[in-house]
Structure formats: C-alpha cells, structure tokens
Amino acid sequence: MSAPVTLLSGDNGSGKSTLIEAIAVAAGFNPEGGTTSFNFATRATESSLGGHLTLVRTPGRKPRTGFFLRAESYYNVATEIERLGVTGSYGGVSPHQRSHGESFLDLVAHRFGPGGLYLLDEPEAALSVQGCLALLLRIADLVADGSQFVIATHSPILLACPGATILEIGPGGGIEPVSFDQAEPVVMTRAFLADPARFLGRLT
Ligand SMILES: Nc1ncnc2c1ncn2[C@@H]1O[C@H](COP(=O)(O)OP(=O)(O)OP(=O)(O)O)[C@@H](O)[C@H]1O
Ligand SMILES: [Mg+2]
C-alpha cells in the first residue's frame, strides 16, 4: 500500500475491517479507534492479524500524526475525546453535541493534519453525498501535504478519489487492484440507477 490513497472495496464480510484494524494495530493505534495515544477498550474483539503484519515504511517518512476512524465505534472515541478534555483539537465542540456526519467532518477538518497516516473504515456511514465530496476535497489537501490514507468503503463517490489505488477483496478472499469502472459498488450503483425498477420489481 504505497499509494497516497488506498481504497479497500469488497462485499459485506469480505474482510475489509479485519484488514484495516490489523494495519491500525500494527501501526500502534488503539484497536477501537482514535489516535495512537488513545488507550481505552470497551470490548476487545480485534483479531490477532495485527500482530503478524509488518508495516514497511519509506525511510524518513514516519507519520507525524494519524487517526483510526471506525464508524461503528466512533461513539466511544467521542466519549474518550471528552474524557481527555481535547475537544479543542476537534473543532471545539464535543462530537457528542454534533450530528454523526458533522462530527466526522469536524474530525477531518480540525484533527487531521499534514504528514499523517489515516485509516478510515466506512467514513461514508455518516456522510451525505455532499459530505463525501467534502471529505474527498480534504483528502486531496492532506495528500498534497504528505499524508497517507487507507479507506475501507462501499461508496462509489469515495471510490472516485483521484489518484487512488482501489484494492477489491473478492469472494475467495483474493485481493486485486481494480479500476474505478470495474469496482463492484460502482458497477452495481450504475446498474441500479440506470433502471431501479428492474431491481425493485423482484420485491413486489
Ligand atoms: N470478532 C470476530 N470474530 C470472529 N469472526 C469475525 C469477527 N469480526 C468479524 N468476523 C468475521 O470475519 C469476516 C470479515 O469481517 P469484516 O468485518 O472484516 O468484513 P467487512 O469486509 O469489513 O464487512 P462490512 O462491509 O460488512 O463491514 C466476516 O465473515 C465476519 O463474520
Ligand atoms: Mg467492515
């Protein structure tokens, strides 16, 4: 994963979160999300894969900062941000007092900075189409400032991230690079939007 932005695609249960969590653990992040200094655990469910991964770093490119964002446990991360009294680094308002999407956009706007390693698991879970486009703009700025992103996503909009490498995990567990036009969420969304009735006809 040497590209500035690597997007992990694949069906539900294909292993994206397991992989991104293992990278996070190997990189020293809290398995439940947050920065490398977060050290809370509500329930240890991480796989042991992280202990078997060796991360290869470009010499002289140790991340200056970073964040592991997992949509499913951001509530607990928000509680930790409040407990540590560091809301100032997140836009000044506790994530608990913002909407789900607002709190994500606060995070990327205020806490993310140059030269960072950012591991994001389905950030689109909180975001509107506009929010996804705002995230793409912020990613472009941070990449220009030397940051690296690994993002698990089902979003055709995030898969359009310029210059990104898309790795798709197939049904057999194989990981293949694919183009934007080949990526499954793009193919399926295009087919659905071209003729919703064809898909929905089976429901009635
Ligand atoms: N704590 C766990 N213990 C055992 N198996 C697990 C655990 N968490 C997930 N799995 C299994 O590992 C497989 C991969 O799960 P994973 O969460 O990585 O998928 P995913 O690609 O992120 O899916 P989704 O798109 O639904 O988020 C699934 O079959 C899942 O049931
Ligand atoms: Mg997942």
For each of these PLM feature ranges, what is it?
Residues 3-6, 115-116:
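Pre-Walker A (Motif I) flank of P-loop NTPase domains
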Residues 5-7, 17-83:
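ABC ATPase nucleotide-binding domain signature region
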Residues 9-10, 122:
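The Walker A (P-loop) glycine that initiates the GxxxxGKT/S ATP-binding motif of P-loop NTPases
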Residues 13-14:
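ATP-binding Walker
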Residues 78-98:
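Conserved P-loop NTPase mechanochemical-coupling segment
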Residues 98-122, 130-142:
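GG-anchored amphipathic helix commonly corresponding to the ABC/SMC/Rad50 NBD signature/C-loop
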Residues 130-151, 155-204:
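C-terminal lobe/lid and adjacent interdomain/linker elements of RecA-like ASCE P-loop ATPase modules
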